[in-house]
Amino acid sequence: MVRSLLFALLSVAGLVAGDAADLVGTWSSKSNQVFTGPGFYDPIDELLIEPALPGISYSFTEDGWFEEASYQVSGNPKNPACPKASLIYQHGKFELLDNGTLILHPIEVDGRQLFSDPCSDNGISTYTRYNQTEVFKSFETFIDPYHGVYTLQLYQFNGAPLPPLYLAYRPPMMLPTETLNPTDGSTGSHPTGSSESESQESDDTSKRSLLKKRSLREHVKRSLENRYKTNAVKKSDSIFNAAFVWYTSFFLVGAGSLIFISS
């Protein structure tokens, strides 16, 4: 009972509303399987990597950058074999207003969404750019009295609480805080409040068509590669490799020794 009371006192004492410094870090939902950073999105090959379980993660830096990783699955009551899944990546700058409102301004050209509806898309997932400004009416951080960990509670624009997020990393685990996939003619972040498809430019349109043809499996195929980096090196096809040189040297030294002994 004393321990519970202590945690309760700590949570009340540690309750902070609207303090940007307390946002710093990587926060993850209860599943503890979704985290921002290179384990969720590969900006080089533009691959979204499917976590083991659904969840959401936010990261914040001291200089005003944020990153979001979301993996949501919604069931289909009429057909349980047809759940819809969505993977979303965004990053950009955040703004904290005087009234405690937190606004996330994503970089327009960097957001990505992979949407899968197996009973409607014939097994072909849709991969598009994504740009969604997010507004949180307020937030607070505190020590959870049950788990004893730092907790971030975000409140939606209407005041409804989101599921709590728990501190996973501090400093945060994030991709570089800069535009990752710049395009010609891009002018920075212009949030629209809704998801967007590829640019209307012909080259981007062609790229979008190609991406849409890829399956979910193809987009997440590098999951294990990214999580468990290999230390393998490229094998040389030349006969003059290290093993050849070593055995040749050994043979020559041995032959020379025999000649010296017999002479």
Curated annotation (Swiss-Prot):
Protein name per its UniProtKB record: Protein ROT1
Membrane topology type: Single-pass type I membrane protein
GO CC term, one of those recorded: endoplasmic reticulum membrane
Ranges of Polar residues composition bias in the record: 178-193
Annotated segments matching region Disordered: 177-212
Cytoplasmic side: 263
Sequence intervals crossing the membrane: 242-262
